From Swiss-Prot:
Residues 35-103, 170-174 form a propeptide. Pfam families: NMU. The modification Asparagine amide is found at N166. The gene is NMU. Residues 1-34 form the signal peptide. Belongs to the NmU family. GO terms for cellular component: extracellular region; terminal bouton. GO terms for biological process: eating behavior; energy homeostasis; G protein-coupled receptor signaling pathway; gastric acid secretion; negative regulation of eating behavior; negative regulation of gastric acid secretion; negative regulation of gastric emptying; neuropeptide signaling pathway. The modification Methionine sulfoxide is found at M139. Its main location: secreted. This is Neuromedin-U.
């Protein structure tokens, strides 16, 4: 007579090794979901370094399980579960990133004056570095416009460039 144990297919050692981290991941995700109670919350009791470490551990665990394709049905369920958990928990920024962002936003319009030249510091916004070039192009354009003017152009040009705020025109431009 054959025993029922001998009829059962045995799982290879690789599946057992993959099942224990899978169990740990499911326990971790169940613990996070139990604390959530239906609405995503932030881990408020953790320091920023601890939040970043927790995020990295969850990310590493999810990526390691998603790379193992032993069971396609389980990997699809794990993938959905990992994406759901990763979507609920916002990724904490490192402290250096926050400091750099604040420093950039505060100092982006500052310039360093060395002697007679205006040297733009490295934290200036890239678009603000183009302002001197725009001024040079505008001056070149006005020089070209002056060369090709008719006798009547100076009257209308004076009105548009030197119009007083109160609406009156000076005697030189009439």
């Amino acid at each position: 007579m054959l025993r029922t144990e001998s009829c059962r297919p045995r799982s290879p050692a690789g599946q057992v090794a993959a099942a224990s981290p899978l169990l740990l991941l499911l326990l971790l995700l169940a613990w996070c979901a139990g604390a959530c109670r239906g609405a995503p919350i932030l881990p408020q009791g953790l320091q920023p370094e601890q939040q970043l470490q927790l995020w990295n551990e969850i990310d590493d665990t999810c990526s390691s399980f998603l790379s193992i394709d032993s069971q396609p049905q389980a990997s699809n369920a794990l993938e959905e579960l990992c994406f759901m958990i990763m979507g609920m928990l916002p990724k904490p920024q490192e402290q250096d990133e926050k400091d750099n962002t604040k420093r950039f936003l505060f100092h982006y319009s500052k310039t360093q004056k060395l002697g007679k030249s205006n040297v733009v510091s490295s934290v200036v916004h890239p678009l603000l570095q183009l302002v001197p070039h725009l001024h040079e192009r505008r001056m070149k354009r006005f020089r070209v416009d002056e060369e090709f003017q008719s006798p009547f152009a100076s009257q209308s040009r004076g009105y548009f460039l030197f119009r007083p705020r109160n609406g009156r025109r000076s005697a030189g431009f009439i």
